[in-house]
Design a protein with these regions (language model features):
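Helix C-cap/helix->beta junction micro-motif
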Residues: 140, 200-201, 319, 350
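Walker B catalytic acidic pair
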Residues: 209
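Conserved core of the PLP fold type I
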Residues: 60-197, 213-214, 218-233
Length: 366
């Protein structure tokens, strides 16, 4: 009665962590500190409260599947600042759609890839992985081909050594920059090569850029899929980019962001939303517009994370010769002898909740 393909979703990182720690008590002398998921604890700007308040009556209206004009314009201006020149290849009515955060669309885009090739199909997924990428791959009806993100490749998957038979059958590929959880940043050439592969072999390239606005301020801003598409020409063919306010604006609970890309993908996604997925309520769209208009709060967040990493480096560098502050994101990916045992010790001794790396990854090639 229930599709057994989804049984694998029971094997997910947060459920595993709960099971690992459920019989262990944290140290009562310390406040519990959750460092096991990407939930910012910084405050949202006060103007968000104002936007939600003055638009209270809009809660009575069904939200459209497309962006309201205020949000479309704010997103386009944000793209002009973030990916200069990319606005020239974007039609705000055809290439952009608001989303309730990116977890849902990362999953649903897999449905759009289903039945786009004949026979057994493949989905290429970065490993370690965010669980929505796996869910989307399953929904595409494909067998997952895991690509390891290793330190020798700046914690990005090596996309140039994918077997031809996998590329021929691929319907969707998920990559992430800055990478989750390592914080590795893809170069422009890397992203261009990914787009060229998608176009040559006819699959959807889904680029998760949810951490794209969290980076070290002494480094250049990360480039993105739109920069790569612009450098290749004047279109967004085969590409879809995911952007969220959860990390950029400390707005995880607001569930707001956008996807931008190939008109055919966006058009199908709008139809999917209209028939059975979640549009973004108008008050949230208006609050999201105000957040995309403002850069100051995001800069403050980057400063905060920079300071945190400097403190961590001071304490951990003596114990880790190869300690490196990640170029992007706000996670710290540390090599330990036994990740599960380390998680239990940190919980029992310091009330610190961390995620064992093995829970975010699949064992591939030993």
């Amino acid at each position: 009665m229930v599709n057994s393909d989804y049984n694998v979703l029971k094997d997910w990182m947060f459920g595993k962590l709960n099971f690992l720690l459920e019989d262990l008590d944290p140290n009562p002398n310390y406040s519990i500190l959750k460092m096991s998921l990407g939930e910012p604890t910084l405050k949202m700007p006060d103007f968000v409260r104002h936007e939600l308040s003055i638009n209270f009556n809009e809660w009575g209206k069904y939200p459209p599947s497309a962006a309201i004009p205020e949000l479309s314009n704010s997103i386009l201006k944000y793209i002009e600042r973030r990916n200069p020149g990319a606005e020239k290849i974007i039609n705000i009515n055809k290439n952009i759609v608001p989303v309730p955060g990116t977890r849902e669309p990362l999953h649903l885009v897999g449905l759009l890839a289903k039945n786009t090739k004949v026979g057994e199909t493949s989905a290429i997924v970065t490993n370690p992985f965010y669980h929505a990428w796996r869910a989307g791959s399953i929904s595409s009806g494909s067998k997952i081909h895991w690509l390891n993100a290793l330190p020798e490749n700046q914690y990005l998957p090596n996309i140039l050594n994918i077997p031809e038979k996998i590329l021929d059958t691929c319907v969707i590929m998920y990559i992430c920059s800055p990478s989750n959880p390592h914080g590795g940043i893809a170069s422009l050439n890397y992203l261009k090569n990914a787009i060229l592969l998608a176009r040559k072999y006819g699959f959807i390239l889904a680029i998760d850029e949810c951490y794209n606005d969290i980076y070290r301020l002494n480094k250049p801003k990360p480039v993105g899929g739109l920069d790569a598409a612009l450098s290749l020409g004047d279109n967004l063919d085969n590409l879809i980019v995911f952007n969220s306010l959860s990390k950029r604006s400390n707005a995880s609970g607001m569930r707001a962001g956008f996807i931008v890309g190939d008109e055919k993908i966006i058009d199908s996604y709008k139809l999917l939303v209209s028939n059975g997925a979640s549009p973004v309520p108008i008050p949230i769209q208006k609050a999201a517009a105000s957040l995309y208009d403002d850069e100051e709060h995001n800069t403050k967040a980057c400063i905060h994370y920079d300071q945190n990493f400097q403190i961590v480096e001071e304490y951990l560098k003596p114990f880790y010769e190869d300690f490196k502050i990640p170029d992007g994101g706000f996670f710290l990916w540390l090599k330990v002898d036994d990740d599960e045992e380390a998680a239990k010790i940190l919980w029992k001794k310091f009330s610190l909740r961390v995620m064992p790396g093995r829970y975010m990854a699949k064992e591939v090639d030993g």
